[in-house]
Amino acid sequence: MDFISFKEKEISKKECLELFENTENFFDVIKLADSLRKDIVGDAVTYVVNANINFTNICTGTCGFCAYKAEHGDPHAFFLNPDEVAKKALEARKIGATEVCIQGGLLKEIDTYFQAEILKKVKEITAPYGKIDVHAFSPMEVKSAAENAGLNVKEALKILKESGLNSMPGTAAEILNDEIRSEICPTKLKTSEWIDVVSNAHKTGIKTTCTMMYGHVEENDHLAEHLSILRNIQKETGGFTEFVPLTFLHENAPLYHTERVKSGASGMLDLKVYAISRIFFKDSIKNIQTSWVKLGTKLSQVSLNCGANDIGGTLMEENISKSAGGSYGTYMSEEQLKDMVLAVGRIPKQRNTAYEIIE
């Protein structure tokens, strides 16, 4: 393979697939990705002081990889009202969080106006303590809430932005292929609908992240297709702030008990996903985030030499990975994140949601 040309040019979806299929040049791929990372974003590794707030675990969704959801009436089910969500955001702001990530479930009771009320309450209660970025509601949540409110997606996004939504997590992407989605998340929004929500969010002035969950039933061609879709959206809107690969946690996932499902990705595939993503996106999506919650500290550190340049956040509360079988904790202090970066010879830098460095 011509790795020299791969450094300079925009590689095609076909070449992306060839990189995933290649088993002989693993370290060449890693070396190229790390070189591109250094050229594009330098040696800084960014992180955000943030808190996750899940306002309910009750959900009507049928995602086969989710072990977090509860039914109405379950002993462990909970549902926070907007005031309770706001109090959690205030607690996070008081101890230094610059971002709160707020997500819930899919329920008839949750419409766009309920989401807007959460945003307003959070902004109001935290205002005396300085600005906090609200990073909230997946594309699936936005679509479901809009339907419950009798709104179209554009109308819903306008209301959310006016109510204080700063950015959105680009989750619910999983694998952007409807055949795969019919297996792993049959009632979740279709590929075209996910594209529609995030594209309209960008056009409304709401930046989003983008994600890819791998290591379950997908094949290499699905990975290449997914990355190509994301790059095409970015060319059109420029609205993605980061790409976050999400390795499938199989231990408690209902999906794992079906015949075709793999027991997660190998460590080699984890690192290839980071590396190939960097080679494929180059500077179109500059920031690639590693997930210490899913990979653990050591593999996350290795990924920083495979194309990644962001180590995510402190989180303070992260229940979804934990429920699925994640064993790496739900909180990491700012000092621990810094030490994790320094240990691999890189420079830790605190950022906000928009990737602006906080000195």
Curated annotation (Swiss-Prot):
Pfam families, alphabetized: CofH_C, Radical_SAM
Cofactor requirement: [4Fe-4S] cluster
MF term (GO), any: 5-amino-6-(D-ribitylamino)uracil--L-tyrosine 4-hydroxyphenyl transferase activity
Cofactor binding remark: Binds 1 [4Fe-4S] cluster. The cluster is coordinated with 3 cysteines and an exchangeable S-adenosyl-L-methionine.
Pathway this chain belongs to: Cofactor biosynthesis; coenzyme F0 biosynthesis
Entry's EC annotation: 2.5.1.147
Assembly description: Consists of two subunits, CofG and CofH.
Role according to the record: Catalyzes the radical-mediated synthesis of 5-amino-5-(4-hydroxybenzyl)-6-(D-ribitylimino)-5,6-dihydrouracil from 5-amino-6-(D-ribitylamino)uracil and L-tyrosine.
Protein name: 5-amino-6-(D-ribitylamino)uracil--L-tyrosine 4-hydroxyphenyl transferase
